[in-house]
């Protein structure tokens, strides 16, 4: 399987990247990012761009893959809706428009855990709008991953300070099932791209289920 991955310089994207590089089901990973990811591997190719919105349909480097793992994103904390919408809505939808052929690809979008019935929350409105729009793009499969706390993958370089706080909560959260390992998240994406899944919204327990299929 050949995949395009975004967000390799962030925590989630890097973890998924490392799982893909270690996983024998993955033949090639094209990392599309603004900066080098800091890893080297025979499977890995990097495509650096300063502006995702400047990428154009028909770009031969973005064609012929089996899946997109769109892990790029930012926190909504301290962001105005217009700013957050560009990163979490406009860019992923533009990226979905320029890769192809869509009918042969699976698009996986990293959304986030939360109550998606509370549309008065800015980040929920934006993420839900993105999820719904991706489902109408004509991909072979489109899945919205909603992970919560994730335990790091061995060898990760891009770790924000807040992750250490989350990890301190790990023993407690583990009791209630609100966590995944980064390896599980990556394996779940690979499984969804290969085999599909009955629902488009992939919650924490669905990630565990999908990861167990590999």
What are these regions (language model features)?
Residues 35, 82, 86-130, 136, ...:
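Conserved Rossmann-fold NAD(P)-dependent oxidoreductase catalytic core, especially the SDR/UDP-sugar
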Residues 3, 38, 45-94, 98-101:
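NAD(P)H-binding glycine-rich loop region in Rossmannoid oxidoreductase-like domains
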Residues 2, 26-28, 105-106, 141:
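Residues at the starts of beta-strands that form the adenosine-phosphate
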Residues 2-23:
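N-terminal Rossmann NAD(P)H-binding glycine-rich loop of SDR-like oxidoreductase domains
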Residues 24, 42, 117-214:
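Oxidoreductase cofactor-interface core, primarily capturing Rossmann-like NAD(P)-dependent enzymes
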Residues 30-38:
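Short, polar loop motifs at secondary-structure junctions
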